[in-house]
Structures are given as C-alpha cells and as structure tokens.
Regions:
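A glycine-rich, hydrophobic/aromatic-adjacent loop/helix-cap motif
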Residues: 2-259
Length: 259
C-alpha cells in the first residue's frame, strides 16, 4: 500500500454550479483511496451524476467477483488440482494505477509480463479523469501484443474485504472483464486476475489516433485529478520498477508530463 494515503476528503459530488450533472473537476485534485471504496463514495459520485445508470450495485459486483473466483476453481479442478478453496493467496496483475496506487495490502510484488494483451489508452473516463463534455482516457488491456507490469499478491487473510473493495474500484461501471491470465515472473509463472477492457462497454474508445489521445489526456480532468497526472504517475511507476514502455514514454513526452 502507498506510504501516504491520498484520502483527505470524499470524491466531490455534483453541485448546482456545473452543467449536466457533472462533478466540477476543479474542486478535487486527489487520488482515489481505500476510505472512498469502503464507504462507497466512488459509486455515490456516479449516482449523483448523469452517469448514475452505469453504476453497479454491490450485489452485481459480488456476483462478478464470485464468478471470477469460481472460474479459478473450475480451471484448477479440470487440471486435477483442487487446492483453490478460497483460502489461497490471489495475484492481481497491475498495469496502470494499481502499480502506483494499489490501495490493498500487498504481501509480495513481482515484475511480470503477460501475452495476448497490451496496455492501451482505450477507456473513456467521464468522471474520475474527465467529464462527459471533456472525457479523459485511462488504461485498459486490449487485444494483441504483450504487457509488462506487476504481479501483486494479496494474502488470503485480507481477501474477504479487499477483493470487494478492488471490485468497487475497477468494476464500478463494468468497463472491464476480470480475466485470469498467466503472469510470467523471474520467480516463475503465476495465475493472476487482470482487468481486461470490455469491448462491449459504453466506455470503450477503441484504437484512437495518437493526436486525439494526446489532446484528451492534456485537457481532461475529473474528480480524481488531471488525466495527465494519471499518465505521469503510471509512467513513473513503471520506471521505478525498471519496466520499459516506449509507447507510454512517448505519450508522456507529447503530453508534457514525461520525466
């Protein structure tokens, strides 16, 4: 977990001073924190905006979580391995903000690489890093290529509470599909949950021209801060762990937020 919790006040809810039910991005410049997730403030921000119909309930989140864990049990059973009972540690593959703001307690961290998916600014952000009128872009895993990031181990003792909070964060509108991936590390491969872009989501941006990506990242801001800050933090987080991403580094330079 980060040494300094970025939580000082709840995400800003919409007020009468801005248009179309959108939160005023100028009122908040801080990252999401655990307290926001524990008290449901992120979902509340959606419910108080004109994006309310997109917010998932805890029941729907729990169903998605149960399905994801059930998929893991099924895979192990087919392989003749019945050791996954819900009491095993779980790995999460981090490729964006989970690298520099994981929020949940991390028992172990490894540099990891997955294949068949790549890091892409393919997810519109109309609340956290932008607005409906001026949407930001954040990262998703899209089809093809490979991606280096971090495998983060969550120990079994924390899973009952922390996995639901993780789902409240990543699956607040169902923009991702939680997917088990093979994360290859120097210490061996591990099965990890990755939040892969849901290409059927309202928020899927697809493959955009670089110029448009740069424009949106440079201009957009939302309740969790500027989109350019998200890019800068991700670029710095990767560099801290010795992970090279030439495409991300180029975007950071073009957006004026490179190291």
């Amino acid at each position: 977990m980060n040494a300094v919790d970025p939580c000082h006040s709840p995400p800003v809810a919409p007020t009468a001073s801005h248009s179309a039910g959108q939160p005023d991005a100028s009122l908040a410049r801080r990252e999401l924190c655990r307290e926001d997730l524990a008290r449901g403030s992120l979902r509340d921000a959606y419910l108080k905006s004109d994006l309310a119909d997109l917010a998932w309930s805890d029941a729907r989140l729990q169903h998605s979580l149960d399905h994801t864990l059930g998929t893991a049990r099924g895979r192990r059973k087919q392989a003749g391995n019945n050791t996954f009972t819900g009491s095993a540690d779980i790995w999460i593959f981090a490729y964006g903000s989970l690298i520099w703001n994981p929020i949940f307690p991390i028992a172990e961290k490894r540099v990891a690489r997955i294949y068949g998916l790549h890091r892409s600014f393919c997810l519109w952000s109309r609340l956290g890093r932008g607005t409906r009128e001026n949407p930001g872009l954040v990262l998703g895993l899209d089809d093809g290529g490979a991606c280096s990031g971090l495998a983060l181990r969550m120990d079994a003792a924390h899973q009952a509470e922390e996995l639901l909070l993780l789902w409240r964060r990543e699956m607040v509108t169902g923009a991702y599909t939680p997917t088990w991936v093979k994360a290859r590390t120097a210490q061996g491969a591990v099965d990890a949950i990755a939040f892969v872009m849901n290409q059927h989501s309202h928020a899927y941006a697809g493959r955009l021209p670089e110029a448009q990506i740069v424009e949106n990242i440079r201009q957009a801001a939302g309740i969790n801060g500027r989109c350019s800050e998200y890019l800068a933090q991700t670029s710095a987080g990767l560099a801290t762990h010795g992970i090279a991403d030439a495409g991300l580094k180029r975007l950071a330079a073009l957006c004026g937020c490179g190291a």
